[in-house]
């Protein structure tokens, strides 16, 4: 969470820092109780079988990335969870994935997904929502 505060102090664009300092609001559909609610699954395939298609031209996007099962030690049920996934356009999904693979000024030379490793689920979830807002 301290790292998120550092981002809000100017490392990211005004839109994202505003979202971080102003809280999560706007037109995004997500469940802020993702850390304690939702239906969890052992695999992504099981989750997709439950939720179905993301819709034409869309893909499923994990708010806290699947890589964080290994990197942060989160359980599959936390990541493969109905409260940790949303349908976004393929174009937006590719842009977000590229961002998570990039080095940003606030990541101390690490790619974003590695910088996130070890932060709490709730901090990563809030960060993920703010990244989605930045690209939508």
Segments (PLM) and residue ranges:
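Generic alpha-helix signal with a bias toward terminal, lower-confidence helices
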Residues: 19, 70-76, 127-128, 133
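Betabetaalpha-Me/HNH-type nuclease active-site subdomain
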Residues: 31-102
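Alpha-helix capping and helix-coil boundary motifs
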Residues: 2-3, 11, 43, 116-120
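Hydrophobic, membrane-inserting alpha-helical segments
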Residues: 1-37
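Solvent-exposed, well-ordered amphipathic alpha-helical segments
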Residues: 7, 11, 15, 57-58, ...
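Catalytic cores of phosphodiester-bond-cleaving enzymes
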Residues: 86-136
């Amino acid at each position: 969470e301290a790292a998120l505060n550092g981002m809000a102090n100017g490392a990211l664009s005004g839109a994202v820092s505003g979202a971080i300092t102003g809280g999560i609001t706007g037109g995004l559909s997500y469940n802020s109780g993702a850390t304690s609610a939702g239906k969890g699954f052992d695999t992504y395939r099981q989750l997709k079988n439950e939720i179905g298609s993301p819709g034409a031209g869309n893909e499923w996007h994990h708010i806290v990335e699947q890589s964080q099962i290994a990197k942060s030690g989160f359980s599959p049920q936390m990541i493969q969870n109905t409260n940790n996934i949303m349908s976004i356009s393929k174009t937006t999904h590719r842009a977000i994935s590229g961002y998570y693979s990039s080095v940003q000024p606030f990541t101390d030379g690490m790619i974003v997904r590695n910088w996130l490793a070890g932060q709490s689920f709730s901090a990563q979830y809030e960060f993920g929502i703010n990244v989605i807002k930045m690209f939508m």
